[in-house]
């Protein structure tokens, strides 16, 4: 009996900067462990497929191609797991790069949420590489050969659960996206977060 609770987890994979194949392998191992523990929702860190500290490597098409290939491996691995997984990945849309959270399960991508607020102070200078969520005017994106919903206001609903996603700095602003998500029915907010140390 679960008494209406949902079993959730956060997972921090061992990560190597710009080694998408290695990182996706670590993520898949954690997905399999989550499946053994009957986790229903598992949240991974921001940019966990590439590593957060890639710097100007984010401008390299090879890294971005490898990131999407690694994401495809992870999506395929979810065919054997029951958990909804949320992973961080840099993704392109029409020559613009976004820091995104990808919501996946059952071998499919349910939606992709771009980061709304990019930090640009101290050691953080994401605006050098990424566009903010409001810089997209399309409601979908082609990723891993799938056309999927894309935007900062996505809600993922199943039964009585309505889930929303935000990334790191989004939580730090005066009125975070989670406030609006909650007003629109979200009862679970998943936050992907990473800070270099």
Give the predicted meaning of each segment.
Residues 1-195:
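Enzyme catalytic cores with a strong preference for nitrogen-chemistry domains
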């Amino acid at each position: 009996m679960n008494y209406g609770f949902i079993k959730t987890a956060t997972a921090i994979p061992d990560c190597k900067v710009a080694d998408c194949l290695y990182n996706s392998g670590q993520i898949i191992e954690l997905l399999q462990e989550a499946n053994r523990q009957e986790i229903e929702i598992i949240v991974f860190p921001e940019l966990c497929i590439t590593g957060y500290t890639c710097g100007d490597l984010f401008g390299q098409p090879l890294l971005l191609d490898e990131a999407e290939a690694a994401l495809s491996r992870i999506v395929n691995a979810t065919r054997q797991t029951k958990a909804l997984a949320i992973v961080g990945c840099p993704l392109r849309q029409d020559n613009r790069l976004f820091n995104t959270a990808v919501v996946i399960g059952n071998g499919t991508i349910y939606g992709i949420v771009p980061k709304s607020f990019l930090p640009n102070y101290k050691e953080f200078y994401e605006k050098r590489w990424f566009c903010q969520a409001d810089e997209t005017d399309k409601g979908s994106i082609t990723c891993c050969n799938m056309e999927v919903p894309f935007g900062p206001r996505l809600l993922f609903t199943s039964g009585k659960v309505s889930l929303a996603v935000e990334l790191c700095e989004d939580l730090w602003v005066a009125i975070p996206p989670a406030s609006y998500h909650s007003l629109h029915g979200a009862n679970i907010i998943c936050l992907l977060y990473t800070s270099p140390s």
